[in-house]
Amino acid sequence: MRALVTGGAGFIGSHLIDRLVARGDHVVVLDNLSSGHLSFIQEHLDNGNATLVQADITQFDEVMGAMKGIDCVYHLAANPDIRLGTRITDTDLKQGTLATYNIVEAMRLNNVGTIAFASSSVVYGEDAPLPTPESHGPCMPISLYGASKQAGEGLISSWVGTFGIQAYIFRFANIIGTRGTHGVIFDFIHKLKKDPSRLEVLGNGLQEKSYMEVGDCADAILHVMSCSNDSLNLYNLGSHDTASVRRIAEIVVETTGCHDASIEYTGGDRGWAGDIPRAMLGIEKMLSTGFDVRYNSEEAIRHTALALIEEIGLNTEMNS
């Protein structure tokens, strides 16, 4: 099997590639390396199990070149900074919606039959019931990132209906873990690295969401694809519970050893424009396939904090 992974040098993509290579696939990594890291996939490049195409998925000709001879696409590339869309408003249009069009059109022209798409819980918006099932609708996202993910789902669904491809759409909870390059835990650790005496938290700390460990996420993708064979397959991927931003701050302060740090809240019920204060995905459909997660939200947070502290070198630097 020849698999194309967009964003493959990134956080989730590199973990997925580890598993694809382990099962014997050859992987073509399509990544512009704007936020990805070669070190995440270097072993696979060195041993010939993966090939890097350093290109931008917003450029159709470059996508076409990478698509030749591919059997299955894992489309994970997107704007990694949700807040950026509030300042540069065409970011998600270009890196999300139009890039997804380039992917599915290049698939059509190269007779590639299957795509797995990384969507997000943010497509549901903030008025959905909790936990939110896949059947909830209409989806009314409140961020430009969420709008681009919903548009990507629509494009893929239309390619299924019009051109007969097979698609797996995965709506992710908040994915965290080793190799993380952004997100609340990453941000908190860097803030404490800069100033161990205080930790600023955006919002009131009561925002509460589901967190899924990245290895669980990658395993869930491949498990669902192995046992679900409809033309269009839609699954929420998440954990059984939630954790608050306040609790995340407490765990990060504890694991970094910055016990004297004061946790200071900026106020308000959301961290930024477009942030959803409370989110929890219904995962009964995922569980019905026989897959379950290894970590609950708090366990995933603690595991991630410890891993990122080591990766960032926080304790070494603070103790030197």
Predicted feature locations:
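Residues in well-ordered alpha-helical elements
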Residues: 61-64, 71, 83, 90, ...
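Hydrophobic alpha-helix immediately C-terminal to the catalytic Tyr-X-X-X-Lys motif of short-chain
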Residues: 151, 155, 159, 188, ...
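C-terminal substrate-binding subdomain of Rossmann-fold SDR/epimerase-dehydratase oxidoreductases
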Residues: 193-320
